[in-house]
Amino acid sequence: MSIKHSKFRKTMAVLAGVLISAGARAQVPPSHPPVALSGASATQQEAKMAANAATKFTHFRVGSKNVKSIFVDGALVWVGTSGGLVRYDTRDDSYKLFDGKSGLLSNGVFYVGRINGRLTVGTYGGGLSFLDERSGKWNNYNIPEGLGDAFVYDVVAAKNGDVWIATWSGVNRVIGGAFDDRSKWHLYTVENTKGGLPNDWVYGLAEGRNGVIWLATEGGMARFAKGRWDNWNHSRGLGAPYEKVKDSIEFKNDPGRASSHHAKQKEEMGLSNVDVAFNPNYVIALEIDRNGDVWAGTWGGGLSRYDGKRWVSYTTSDGLPGNHIFMLHLGVDGKLWIGTNSGLVTWQNEKFSKPLTVADGLFANNVFAMASSAADDLWVGSYGGVAHLRLGK
């Protein structure tokens, strides 16, 4: 097999050491939700070609780190890890690492993208940061500037110019994207929305039709439309019932055992007797397809789809490789990619494709991040690195 990025693989081997040492210097809290490592050996994971000869993978290692976000920016690929932000230039296989030494307030990067033209990073404990690409300096925004919490999971620029920021203490709305005007910062919480926002831990954001903002939280899905809040949880159809998934729950390390926060959630749902990682109210991933349907990835309750009237849930019995959904991504061609705890699958024409796993070339079976290039190449992030899938090549 011809590997186009063999030079980059060598530079990434060097970078792995950089990231490991960076992680030692700046201790980043463990990722949330907990991560299960792939069981594949290094040999199985390295530059493996898919069984389908039309599909090719190249692996880029980043050491003992999670890849939590990827952003394809023309010829540049930005990779957010638990050990810093990597900028990779596909034109010459060069890379640069941004971390605490570069001006970031945290090495844990959970969001990377462009907001109002600026390279933007949401971090794990370091707030929101914008990169001045000419000077290489970071402009940081944290709680004193109006941010609800220092833990930032997602950022969305709405068509009306407002910027929404998902945090662990509610969701910020910056009117007109005026970050330097404190009066433009608003924070929505469970308390000040009177329960309209079902939980203050917000993981995902997306703008739907007519400017509707959708939010994925630890207490279910929320919708903000024309100043009004609505929400859905398991009792309103979100996530598959435990009886449907109980025999296919991979993670036995229930967060409720170690966290009073999660234990209380399960108690409120009547799930105290369920001693595995299952909480269908806990929505980790969110995407909206071309039809306007809303997709929600749950913690053990499979994948749920809202068509404007009701929620329908899909599980391993319907073709998913796993019931813990970590990432949802809409490809250039409109195909929905679903990253799970047991591989990667697509949804198109009302059915799931055959799953891709480490046996087919994925770096690991846990898929945490995805991004597409203009040519519809797919970059897939997992624990330890990124797999570059060149579709149709």
Region locations from a protein language model:
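Compositionally biased, intrinsically disordered low-complexity regions used as flexible
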Residues: M1-S2, T189
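Bacterial N-terminal signal peptides that target proteins for export
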Residues: S2-M12
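Coiled-coil-like amphipathic alpha-helices with heptad-repeat character
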Residues: K4-H5, I20, G83, G300
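Carboxylate-rich, polar loop motifs that coordinate divalent cations or form catalytic acidic clusters
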Residues: K10, Q27-K393
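Bacterial N-terminal signal peptides
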Residues: A13-S21
